[in-house]
Design a protein with these regions (language model features):
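Short, Lys/Arg-enriched, disordered terminal segments
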Residues: 1-5, 187-190
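RNA substrate-binding interface of SAM-dependent RNA methyltransferases
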Residues: 2-110, 176-180
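Solvent-exposed alpha-helices and their adjacent loops that cap or buttress functional pockets
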Residues: 3-6, 98-99, 125-129, 148-149
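Short acidic, S/G/P-rich loop/turn micro-motifs used as interaction or catalytic elements
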Residues: 18-20, 52-55, 112-115, 140-144, ...
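Short, glycine/charged-enriched secondary-structure capping and boundary segments
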Residues: 27, 60-62, 120-123, 149-152
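Short, well-ordered alpha-helix to beta-strand connector turns
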Residues: 42, 102-103, 131, 151-153
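Long, charge-patterned amphipathic alpha-helical coiled-coil/hairpin "stalk" segments used as oligomerization
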Residues: 109-148
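Structured adenosyl-cofactor binding patch, chiefly the S-adenosyl-L-methionine
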Residues: 143-190
């Protein structure tokens, strides 16, 4: 029997480009919607710059609070499970890049720079070979700030056609397509 193939760690990164001072319903909902995806497909979930109330100073407290305020994700059960497994991560907005333990930064966008554009199979090969990846999604109508496009060495358009998707639809599409592609690559190797 062959040992299980070790892949890189995959992380959904949610970057707050809404209001950085006031916590909004959209913040709570996107975490509640992304957590079941992370749990189902064995990804991490990292949030950056969310203005949680000050008393929510740990991921466990954030998960508990979200689970008490939503019916999404089996009433927040998956958010709590992610946190219990150390896979819900809460960070301030990064000032000098993203935490290296999350992996290589990949910008998700419908407008990738041509020279940095990657396909789902490119990302799947990298993850299947052991590279950890942080796939970053911008929240709000403007998406990710342009300065993040500079530091993201890879840009990924899940549609491959420049089509705009609602944030949670994009997250589900990225997680599903990349997880499936990795699974197929690993099946081919075994």
């Amino acid at each position: 029997m062959k040992p299980a193939q070790k892949t890189g760690r995959l992380t959904i990164g949610l970057y707050n480009s809404y209001n950085i001072v006031q916590f909004r319903e959209a913040h709570r909902r996107v975490v509640a919607r992304a957590a079941p995806l992370a749990e189902a497909f064995d990804w991490n979930l990292a949030v950056f710059g969310f203005p949680f109330p000050p008393e929510l100073d740990t991921s466990d407290k954030v998960a508990g609070w979200i689970s008490g305020t939503t019916s999404i994700g089996d009433e927040g059960k998956y958010t709590v499970e992610l946190s219990d497994r150390g896979r819900l991560l809460v960070f301030d907005l990064p000032k000098r890049g993203f935490p290296p333990q999350l992996g290589t930064l990949v910008i998700t966008t419908r407008k990738p720079w041509k020279e940095r554009s990657v396909s789902v199979m490119d990302l799947a090969r990298r993850a299947a070979s052991g590279e950890s990846l942080l796939l970053l999604f911008g929240l709000g109508p403007k998406g990710l700030p342009q300065e993040l496009f500079e530091i993201g060495g890879s840009h990924f358009d899940v549609t491959g056609k420049g089509k705009s998707l609602e944030t949670c639809t994009a997250i589900g599409s990225v997680v599903g397509s990349l997880s499936t592609a990795i699974g197929r690559l690993l099946e081919e190797k075994s």
